[in-house]
C-alpha cells in the first residue's frame, strides 16, 4: 500500500547556509562596522547577537531574508527569549522547531478523516503516517494538507509505492 509521512523538519543544510550568508552580509554592511552582531547555531537553537535592540532587529531581518531566499520557511523558528548580556548588548534565542506537536498531529488526522478521502492517518511519534490504496489519493491528501494547515510548515517524506 502506498504511504508517506507528514513531518515538520527544516532542511538543516539550507538553514546553515542561510546563517553563513547572514553573517557574511552583517560583516560587510556599513551600519554594522565595529559591531559584534552575528548569528550562531547551537544544537536546536539559533542565537542572535546585537549591540542594541535596533541592531538585533536588523540581524533578525537579515536572517529572515536569507532564509526566504534559500526556501527555508521562517515558521520553523520560534522566538524564545531576549536578554541583555553586558552593558547594552542584546542576545536573542530562537528555537528551531523539529517534529510535529501532538496538537498539530491530531489536527492533521482530523482534517484527513473529515475530508472523506480513502486514506488512513496514524500518529507515529513526531510524524503522521498516511496510507492509502492509490497514489492519487495520497497526492490529493498532500494538496489538502498544504491548503488547510497554515500554522506550521509541513513536509512530506518516505513516499512509498
Curated annotation (Swiss-Prot):
Annotated coiled-coil segments of the chain: none
UniProt KW keywords: Nucleotide-binding
Keyword Nucleotide-binding part of the UniProt annotation: yes
Any one GO CC term of the record: cytosol
Superkingdom as given in the UniProt entry: Bacteria
The keyword Nucleotide-binding is annotated on this UniProt entry: yes
MF terms in GO: nucleotide binding
Family the entry assigns: Belongs to the YajQ family.
NCBIfam families to which the protein is assigned, alphabetical: PRK05412.1 (NF003819)
Function: Nucleotide-binding protein.
UniProt-recorded name of the protein: Nucleotide-binding protein Pnec_0318
Organism: Polynucleobacter necessarius subsp. necessarius (strain STIR1)
Amino acid at each position: 500500500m502506498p504511504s508517506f509521512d507528514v513531518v515538520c523538519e527544516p532542511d538543516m543544510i539550507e538553514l546553515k547556509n542561510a546563517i553563513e550568508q547572514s553573517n557574511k552580509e552583517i560583516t560587510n554592511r556599513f551600519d554594522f562596522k565595529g559591531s559584534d552582531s552575528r548569528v550562531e547555531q547551537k544544537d536546536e537553537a539559533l542565537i542572535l547577537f546585537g549591540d542594541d535592540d535596533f541592531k538585533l532587529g536588523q540581524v533578525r531581518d537579515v536572517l529572515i531574508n536569507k532564509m526566504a531566499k534559500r526556501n527555508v520557511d521562517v515558521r520553523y523558528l520560534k522566538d524564545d527569549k531576549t536578554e541583555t548580556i553586558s552593558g547594552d548588548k542584546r542576545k536573542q534565542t530562537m528555537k528551531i522547531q523539529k517534529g510535529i506537536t501532538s496538537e498539530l498531529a491530531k489536527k492533521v488526522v482530523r482534517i484527513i478523516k473529515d475530508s472523506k478521502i480513502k486514506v488512513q492517518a496514524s500518529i507515529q511519534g513526531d510524524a503522521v503516517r498516511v496510507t492509502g490504496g492509490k497514489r492519487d489519493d495520497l497526492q490529493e491528501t498532500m494538496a489538502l494538507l498544504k491548503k488547510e494547515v497554515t500554522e506550521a510548515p509541513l513536509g512530506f517524506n518516505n513516499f512509498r509505492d
